[in-house]
Amino acid sequence: MTYMFQGAEAFNADISNWNVSKVTAMNGCFQNNYKFNIDIGNWDVSSVKSMASVFELYEAGVWGGGVFNQDLDSWNVSNVTNMYFMFQGASMFNPVSYTHLRAHETMV
């Protein structure tokens, strides 16, 4: 799923029921996608090893924007080794309560 919807600025289709259980890399999947705000909290991401820049928002030298703010508390990220810039610039997302995500210091 690496860079699958990168730059698809208006993409907001309901992909909540996708089977992603065999996905190992999600790098930049929703990078620079400003409209995406679908609940994907039920995704089985337990096989994913890299989530770098999944929700990163950066364009024309400016960080920020986007509306993604869904509950990802049920995500099993125990196999993830890279969350670098996962939510960088995703100003609406509030990961404060997601202690299992916060363990990765370079996430934001």
Model-derived regions, located:
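Negatively charged
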Residues: 2-102
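A short, hydrophobic C-terminal helix/tail in secreted or cell-surface proteins
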Residues: 103-108
